[in-house]
Amino acid sequence: TLMRSSAASDVYKRQEEMYLVDLPGYGYAKVSEQEKAQWGKLIERYLHGSKQLRAVFLLIDIRHDPSANDKMMYDWIVDQGFNPIIIATKLDKLKRSQVQKQVKAIKTGLKLLPGTVVIPFSAETKQGRDEIWNLVDTEFLGKGTEE
């Protein structure tokens, strides 16, 4: 996953073209409120301090309607001047017939801005991975989708 419940900020490099920065998650981390507040400051400094930041991805569990934390994080990211790309994780845990219903629940629950992208994704089956990388390549790296 790209955002998770650990205190570390990890950086992943893709073919010398970009860095993917994995910031601490907020959901189920078993840390103090004080530490969560420190994470918030870290994330805010990163969002405002990075001159090369091109996109923000918000990972949300597709199995559930957006939580209060999901809504708060989405609104906060928008308030920081970004329209995050929503990655709806754990796709492999849903029946195929439930996917569109849950995507709609995410869109409605978060009151997404027009044009916000929601990509269902499974780390287990890799479903949605190509769609994410194609979006990154075309929208943020200025490439076509052919490899």
Where are these regions (language model features)?
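Anionic group-transfer/hydrolysis microenvironments
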Residues: 15, 24, 63, 91, ...
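Residue-level signal for inorganic ion chemistry
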Residues: 12, 89, 132
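Conserved C-terminal guanine-recognition region of P-loop GTPase G domains, centered on the G4
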Residues: 44-116
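Residues at secondary-structure transition points
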Residues: 30-41, 68, 97, 101, ...
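Canonical P-loop GTPase G-domain recognition
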Residues: 94-147
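Single conserved hydrophobic/aromatic residue that forms the stacking wall/gate
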Residues: 1-8, 12
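Switch II (G3) loop of P-loop NTPases
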Residues: 18-40, 63
